[in-house]
Amino acid sequence: MKETRDLLFYNENSIDFNFSPEEMDTHQMMCVNNDSQQDTSFLTATTCIFDFQKDIYDDQNLMSFDPFFPQQRDMALWIASVGNGAIDWSTKPQLTLSKKIPDVVNEKGEEITPADLQRHYADKHVAKLPDHSCDLYYLLFKHAKFEATTLRIPLSLLNDNGTGALGPFDEIRSLTDEEQRLLTLLKTISHYSWVTKHATKDCTGQLLDLCKEGLQLVESIQVNKTFNGVILHILVAYFGRRSTALRDEFQLHKLFLEQRLDIELEILAQHGGADAIDSEKLRKVKKLSELWEWFNAIPYNHHPSVSQIEFIASQIGEKVSFVKSWVANKRRTGAKKRSKKPAPSTQIRPALKVFLEKKPFVSRQVV
């Protein structure tokens, strides 16, 4: 379990929040159309909205304190398009990190600066979470030391004394059943994506199925013209992109795991002898049925807790190591048998020898 914890939670000191101007440019969100009338381009404009905004802006730059917000110059238009009575950013479009934000206070009633917001966000959400390449994981999963189970945002710091509104985040409180289902789907997809990338086991089938389901739900809501709020706009852009962009990557990863499993089974057959192939165990390994059951047991209306994620990850580790430990055990028992009867051939093809010499899991480079 300790290895699982190390895998799930990186040391916060290893995350560097300082970026060059070039790197910052790559994380800028797409701008909302400046036309006063809302049009369908708004949907495509959110395509990059999940590119996690971990940049630390200086006072010369406009500040976007949360990944859900576009750049400050588009704030008024964006919020107006949502139409939820949010803070009127049109009167203060050029806020800097050091200037206090009027009417936006913390729990003590003190006006705060954008720098305070960023510091709060980084302390509570970024430094304590896994690999910073997983933008959705930051946004959509709670942490053991930060108990709220909705989107990871500092709601207490976004209170408007004048209206009592929380800006676009009021949308979260009034989601329809379909919208809540989509949001939960997104959480689950984020988890599967992170596990596939970092916890050494493939979730290709689940990811593709969830993406398809999410896209179908979005299309259904659009047809019925019942979609409301910025959350659904984000989901439209996300599912439309994710369902196609991940397919090739996950199919390749799935193919790699299937090939690896075939190789391990071949090694087992070579070194354990025919009597080592127990049909019941072979079925469990071949189908990895127990692994899928662990994931499918997560109900869609429940947000996985950290302890659940750790538990599932530990189960994944056990399933992955099952074949290797089984092979090792059969090798030991096979060595005893060889003293009594002729030993089977111990020659290994070069490809298998190379495979055995590799580390258990091949790290995947994050693009």
UniProtKB/Swiss-Prot annotation:
Residues 273-338 bind DNA. GO terms for cellular component: nucleus. Disulfide bonds: none annotated. It comes from the Eukaryota. One of its GO terms (molecular function) is DNA binding. The keyword Iron-sulfur does not apply. The keyword Repeat does not apply. Keywords: DNA-binding, Homeobox, Nucleus, Repressor, Transcription, Transcription regulation. It is found in: Nucleus. Mating type proteins are sequence specific DNA-binding proteins that act as master switches in yeast differentiation by controlling gene expression in a cell type-specific fashion. Transcriptional corepressor that acts in conjunction with A1 to repress transcription of haploid-specific genes. Forms a heterodimer with A1. Belongs to the TALE/M-ATYP homeobox family. This is Mating-type protein ALPHA2. It comes from Yarrowia lipolytica (strain CLIB 122 / E 150). The lineage of its organism: Eukaryota, Fungi, Dikarya, Ascomycota, Saccharomycotina. The gene is MATB2.
